[in-house]
């Protein structure tokens, strides 16, 4: 018999220890991976609820199983909030991840072998935008576009490639691009050849929800996002569209269920509903504004300390440090900063001479530290410590000094107070 007092700590000490250690790690390390964030306790409450017990294949009002009257309410709340938040008239909240949302878009709009124009992974794109190791690169004919010498998207090149290759779909969005994308320009290019414009806004969804970054929903045929990252919700995906094309909406729904997934994760959808409601609050806008301010403040310090920032700055929540001139690899920088309790990820930079497993850069993002309460003063101090480590990458004494400062500031700015 199940009892409410059952717990992991008493039953599975080995697992509980790992969970507790991860909790400590999150509190005692500064998180600068651009795709990571902290959910609210409300989101975690939803994800730990009895909704995890319920199978609900289908969509609200059209389920294959009985007993769905209350999970229908949960999913409809998430759908309605997603549409309201992003100005869409269609939303599917069932994708288990951003990659699965993207997979659904491909299968809804394309046939295997169709040509797709997507951002080059080495210049800021994402695996699902055409990498040869991903389904997108294996099933479709991918033509990559990239950035110009200033580090900005080269729309002239994009237009030229579109005219030459006649892709059926053009993908906007990125995983490591610090600029503002001109969604209207991309739609203009897509329309010029009769292609779909599909935007993956996963990295900037929170900024978009707060009005800090341009919204692609009015311009794209289809938009996807994750619900974590800047949106600060549970790990999951979301598909949005606007324009009233009911046939398109049916294709998208079918591409999620029954094509790619079976039963939706109702406890995660409840978490999405909570996060979407939180994103409508005034304090969420203040938070996202601070995310952008903090990223700019960090860039300023790195530039002043002689580090090269790809594109020379940032207009969103992330930026790339190019370490080629410092004769450092991204792998070395990642490891050294990690020893100082600062978590980043190695990342390829434009024209990177190193392999993706080594790289010549690191990606830095401000969402998680801003969630802790860091403002410009704190992130500038943090960026200075990072420069100290990178300037003395083999000096363990410097790394230990920085680690002590990190532990102190983490104690002053806890993740969960």
From Swiss-Prot:
UniProt main location, coarse: cytoplasm
Keywords assigned: Amino-acid biosynthesis, Cytoplasm, One-carbon metabolism, Pyridoxal phosphate, Transferase
EC number in record: 2.1.2.1
Any one Gene Ontology molecular-function term assigned to this protein's record: glycine hydroxymethyltransferase activity
One of the GO BP terms on file: tetrahydrofolate interconversion
Pathway recorded for this protein: One-carbon metabolism; tetrahydrofolate interconversion; Amino-acid biosynthesis; glycine biosynthesis; glycine from L-serine: step 1/1
Catalytic activity: (6R)-5,10-methylene-5,6,7,8-tetrahydrofolate + glycine + H2O = (6S)-5,6,7,8-tetrahydrofolate + L-serine
Cofactor: pyridoxal 5'-phosphate
Modified positions (N6-(pyridoxal phosphate)lysine) in chain numbering: 229
Name of a matching Pfam family: SHMT
Top-level EC class as recorded in UniProt: transferase
GO cellular component labels: cytoplasm; cytosol
Binding positions for (6S)-5,6,7,8-tetrahydrofolate per the UniProt entry: 121, 125-127, 355-357
Residues of the site described as Plays an important role in substrate specificity: 228
Residue stretches spanning the membrane: none
Compartment(s): Cytoplasm
Self-association and partners: Homodimer.
Record family assignment: Belongs to the SHMT family.
Physiological role: Catalyzes the reversible interconversion of serine and glycine with tetrahydrofolate (THF) serving as the one-carbon carrier. This reaction serves as the major source of one-carbon groups required for the biosynthesis of purines, thymidylate, methionine, and other important biomolecules. Also exhibits THF-independent aldolase activity toward beta-hydroxyamino acids, producing glycine and aldehydes, via a retro-aldol mechanism.
Name recorded for this polypeptide: Serine hydroxymethyltransferase
Highest classification ranks of the organism: Bacteria, Pseudomonadati, Pseudomonadota, Gammaproteobacteria, Enterobacterales
